[in-house]
Swiss-Prot record:
Stated name of the protein: Corticoliberin
Region Disordered, residue ranges: 75-94, 114-146
Induction (record text): Up-regulated during water-avoidance stress.
Biased composition (Basic and acidic residues): 117-129
One GO location term (cellular component): synapse
Length: 187
Protein backbone atom coordinates (compact mmCIF):
# COMPACT_ATOMS: atom_id res chain seq x y z
CA UNK A 1 0.00 0.00 0.00
CA UNK A 2 2.76 2.43 0.91
CA UNK A 3 4.74 1.51 -2.18
CA UNK A 4 1.75 2.20 -4.45
CA UNK A 5 1.20 5.53 -2.71
CA UNK A 6 4.85 6.52 -3.09
CA UNK A 7 4.93 5.50 -6.75
CA UNK A 8 1.71 7.43 -7.44
CA UNK A 9 3.01 10.51 -5.62
CA UNK A 10 6.29 10.31 -7.53
CA UNK A 11 4.51 10.04 -10.87
CA UNK A 12 2.36 13.05 -10.00
CA UNK A 13 5.39 15.10 -8.97
CA UNK A 14 7.17 14.29 -12.21
CA UNK A 15 4.08 15.00 -14.33
CA UNK A 16 3.06 18.21 -12.59
CA UNK A 17 6.46 19.76 -11.98
CA UNK A 18 7.47 22.49 -14.39
CA UNK A 19 10.68 21.57 -16.17
CA UNK A 20 13.29 24.18 -16.97
CA UNK A 21 14.60 24.01 -20.55
CA UNK A 22 17.95 22.34 -21.02
CA UNK A 23 20.66 24.89 -21.84
CA UNK A 24 22.45 22.44 -24.14
CA UNK A 25 19.34 22.16 -26.28
CA UNK A 26 18.83 25.91 -26.23
CA UNK A 27 22.33 26.56 -27.57
CA UNK A 28 21.54 24.70 -30.82
CA UNK A 29 20.35 27.66 -32.83
CA UNK A 30 19.17 26.48 -36.24
CA UNK A 31 18.12 22.93 -35.46
CA UNK A 32 14.49 22.42 -36.51
CA UNK A 33 12.02 21.75 -33.71
CA UNK A 34 14.64 22.70 -31.13
CA UNK A 35 13.35 24.97 -28.38
CA UNK A 36 14.63 28.51 -28.44
CA UNK A 37 16.08 30.53 -25.61
CA UNK A 38 13.46 32.40 -23.59
CA UNK A 39 12.85 35.88 -24.95
CA UNK A 40 12.70 38.93 -22.65
CA UNK A 41 9.22 40.13 -21.83
CA UNK A 42 7.86 42.76 -24.18
CA UNK A 43 4.71 44.39 -22.86
CA UNK A 44 3.85 45.90 -26.25
CA UNK A 45 3.33 42.52 -27.92
CA UNK A 46 0.06 40.65 -27.35
CA UNK A 47 0.22 37.89 -24.78
CA UNK A 48 0.52 34.42 -26.27
CA UNK A 49 -1.76 31.66 -24.97
CA UNK A 50 -0.39 29.73 -22.03
CA UNK A 51 0.22 26.00 -22.31
CA UNK A 52 -2.52 24.02 -20.54
CA UNK A 53 -1.52 22.45 -17.26
CA UNK A 54 -2.31 18.78 -16.61
CA UNK A 55 -5.52 18.09 -14.71
CA UNK A 56 -5.93 15.18 -12.34
CA UNK A 57 -9.39 13.67 -12.65
CA UNK A 58 -10.80 10.96 -10.41
CA UNK A 59 -13.52 8.71 -11.79
CA UNK A 60 -14.56 5.77 -9.65
CA UNK A 61 -11.43 4.22 -8.28
CA UNK A 62 -9.16 5.21 -11.17
CA UNK A 63 -7.17 8.39 -11.70
CA UNK A 64 -6.69 9.91 -15.11
CA UNK A 65 -4.19 12.61 -16.03
CA UNK A 66 -5.60 14.71 -18.88
CA UNK A 67 -3.25 16.91 -20.85
CA UNK A 68 -4.27 19.45 -23.43
CA UNK A 69 -7.54 21.21 -24.05
CA UNK A 70 -10.32 20.13 -21.72
CA UNK A 71 -12.88 21.60 -24.12
CA UNK A 72 -12.24 18.67 -26.45
CA UNK A 73 -13.68 16.14 -24.04
CA UNK A 74 -16.52 13.64 -24.34
CA UNK A 75 -18.71 16.26 -22.64
CA UNK A 76 -19.15 18.06 -25.96
CA UNK A 77 -21.34 15.20 -27.21
CA UNK A 78 -23.96 15.72 -24.51
CA UNK A 79 -26.38 18.57 -24.22
CA UNK A 80 -25.56 20.99 -21.39
CA UNK A 81 -28.72 20.24 -19.42
CA UNK A 82 -28.49 16.43 -19.39
CA UNK A 83 -27.51 14.88 -16.09
CA UNK A 84 -27.60 11.34 -14.75
CA UNK A 85 -30.43 12.44 -12.45
CA UNK A 86 -32.70 13.37 -15.38
CA UNK A 87 -32.33 9.90 -16.87
CA UNK A 88 -34.46 8.49 -14.08
CA UNK A 89 -33.65 6.80 -10.82
CA UNK A 90 -34.32 3.28 -12.12
CA UNK A 91 -32.01 3.43 -15.12
CA UNK A 92 -28.26 3.51 -14.60
CA UNK A 93 -26.27 5.84 -16.87
CA UNK A 94 -23.82 4.20 -19.23
CA UNK A 95 -20.08 4.52 -18.63
CA UNK A 96 -19.65 7.01 -21.50
CA UNK A 97 -22.60 9.08 -20.34
CA UNK A 98 -21.31 9.15 -16.75
CA UNK A 99 -17.82 10.15 -17.93
CA UNK A 100 -19.22 12.85 -20.19
CA UNK A 101 -21.37 14.24 -17.38
CA UNK A 102 -18.36 14.23 -15.07
CA UNK A 103 -16.32 16.20 -17.62
CA UNK A 104 -19.21 18.64 -18.11
CA UNK A 105 -19.42 19.30 -14.37
CA UNK A 106 -15.64 19.62 -14.16
CA UNK A 107 -15.60 22.16 -16.99
CA UNK A 108 -18.32 24.16 -15.27
CA UNK A 109 -16.26 24.21 -12.08
CA UNK A 110 -13.11 25.27 -13.95
CA UNK A 111 -14.94 28.09 -15.74
CA UNK A 112 -16.36 29.58 -12.52
CA UNK A 113 -14.22 32.44 -11.19
CA UNK A 114 -12.55 31.74 -7.89
CA UNK A 115 -13.39 34.02 -4.99
CA UNK A 116 -11.08 34.77 -2.13
CA UNK A 117 -12.21 33.96 1.39
CA UNK A 118 -11.40 37.43 2.67
CA UNK A 119 -13.46 39.25 0.01
CA UNK A 120 -15.31 41.28 2.65
CA UNK A 121 -13.50 44.48 3.45
CA UNK A 122 -13.34 46.11 6.85
CA UNK A 123 -15.48 49.27 7.35
CA UNK A 124 -12.36 51.47 7.41
CA UNK A 125 -11.17 49.94 4.13
CA UNK A 126 -14.61 50.47 2.58
CA UNK A 127 -14.46 54.14 3.52
CA UNK A 128 -11.05 54.46 1.90
CA UNK A 129 -12.40 52.80 -1.26
CA UNK A 130 -15.29 55.29 -1.38
CA UNK A 131 -12.78 58.12 -1.07
CA UNK A 132 -10.81 56.77 -4.06
CA UNK A 133 -13.74 57.22 -6.39
CA UNK A 134 -17.18 55.92 -7.25
CA UNK A 135 -16.09 54.77 -10.71
CA UNK A 136 -13.95 51.96 -9.30
CA UNK A 137 -16.81 50.85 -7.03
CA UNK A 138 -19.21 50.80 -9.99
CA UNK A 139 -16.82 48.60 -11.95
CA UNK A 140 -16.52 46.24 -8.98
CA UNK A 141 -20.32 46.00 -8.59
CA UNK A 142 -20.69 45.34 -12.32
CA UNK A 143 -18.07 42.59 -12.15
CA UNK A 144 -19.80 41.03 -9.13
CA UNK A 145 -23.17 41.06 -10.89
CA UNK A 146 -21.68 39.11 -13.81
CA UNK A 147 -20.33 36.32 -11.59
CA UNK A 148 -22.65 33.35 -11.12
CA UNK A 149 -23.72 32.85 -7.52
CA UNK A 150 -21.92 30.04 -5.75
CA UNK A 151 -24.16 28.25 -3.30
CA UNK A 152 -23.74 25.31 -0.99
CA UNK A 153 -26.77 23.63 -2.58
CA UNK A 154 -25.04 23.58 -5.96
CA UNK A 155 -21.83 22.29 -4.38
CA UNK A 156 -23.59 19.47 -2.56
CA UNK A 157 -25.64 18.65 -5.66
CA UNK A 158 -22.44 18.30 -7.70
CA UNK A 159 -20.86 16.24 -4.93
CA UNK A 160 -23.88 13.91 -4.85
CA UNK A 161 -23.72 13.58 -8.64
CA UNK A 162 -20.02 12.69 -8.60
CA UNK A 163 -20.50 10.21 -5.75
CA UNK A 164 -23.41 8.59 -7.59
CA UNK A 165 -21.29 8.24 -10.73
CA UNK A 166 -18.43 6.76 -8.70
CA UNK A 167 -20.82 4.30 -7.06
CA UNK A 168 -22.24 3.27 -10.46
CA UNK A 169 -18.72 2.79 -11.83
CA UNK A 170 -17.73 0.70 -8.81
CA UNK A 171 -20.83 -1.49 -9.20
CA UNK A 172 -20.07 -1.97 -12.90
CA UNK A 173 -16.48 -3.00 -12.10
CA UNK A 174 -17.67 -5.39 -9.40
CA UNK A 175 -20.22 -6.96 -11.78
CA UNK A 176 -17.52 -7.36 -14.44
CA UNK A 177 -15.13 -9.05 -12.01
CA UNK A 178 -17.96 -11.31 -10.78
CA UNK A 179 -18.74 -12.32 -14.39
CA UNK A 180 -15.07 -13.16 -14.98
CA UNK A 181 -14.97 -15.21 -11.80
CA UNK A 182 -18.13 -17.11 -12.76
CA UNK A 183 -16.69 -17.84 -16.22
CA UNK A 184 -13.51 -19.23 -14.67
CA UNK A 185 -15.40 -21.36 -12.15
CA UNK A 186 -17.97 -22.48 -14.73
CA UNK A 187 -15.30 -23.92 -17.07
Amino acid sequence: MRLRLLVSAGMLLVALSSCLPCRALLSRGSVPRAPRAPQPLNFLQPEQPQQPQPVLIRMGEEYFLRLGNLNRSPAARLSPNSTPLTAGRGSRPSHDQAAANFFRVLLQQLQMPQRSLDSRAEPAERGAEDALGGHQGALERERRSEEPPISLDLTFHLLREVLEMARAEQLAQQAHSNRKLMEIIGK
